[in-house]
Design a protein with these regions (language model features):
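Intrinsically disordered, low-complexity regions enriched in serine, threonine, proline
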Residues: 1-2, 26
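Positively charged n-region of N-terminal signal peptides that target proteins for export
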Residues: 2-12
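Hydrophobic alpha-helical segments
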Residues: 11-15, 71
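Bacterial N-terminal signal peptides
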Residues: 14-23
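Lipid interaction determinants
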Residues: 22-147
Length: 147
């Protein structure tokens, strides 16, 4: 009987440790459909749901989530940018302190594309990883990135 009780206690402790692990890792890595931090993401398309447009020209628009400092950075196509992020329950994304260098693009269309990107990123409300894609959405639109 003592041996059985000991086995039950071990199972209970293992179950409790598993639950604690899930609770403490919550919506960080992997809970939003997959890993998104410490990966360089490249923007493929942006816009409103059902009306996405591809990135214009040879613009290299990127996004990095730095997990240790909870910072974002990347290229908007013309300018480098930076900010802070937090993940709240259910993969809610909050981006704060978004700033960028102030170089002008020679191409007005690329400058407008960058401004649209920054507006959508600034108003981001959620993120989801779907396979090799990262989807960020909010009140201003949707951003679709690939690894």
């Amino acid at each position: 009987m003592t041996r059985r009780r000991e086995l039950n206690m071990k199972l209970i402790v293992a179950a409790m440790l598993s639950v604690m692990c899930l609770v403490f890792t919550g919506c960080a890595r992997g809970a939003c459909g997959g890993e998104f931090e410490d990966i360089q993401w490249k923007l493929n398309s942006y816009g409103t749901p059902g009306s996405l447009q591809s990135v214009q020209g040879n613009a290299n628009i990127t996004l990095n989530f730095e997990s240790k400092e909870k910072q974002i950075n990347g290229s908007g196509g013309c300018n480098s940018y930076f900010g802070s992020y937090s993940i709240i329950s259910n993969c809610e994304l909050r981006i704060t302190g978004l700033g960028a260098t102030e170089r002008a693009c020679l191409d007005a269309a690329l400058m407008q594309q960058e401004q649209n990107y920054f507006n959508i990123l600034r108003d981001a409300e959620s993120l989801q990883v779907e396979g090799e894609e990262l989807h960020i959405s909010g009140s201003s639109g949707v951003l679709v990135f690939t690894r």
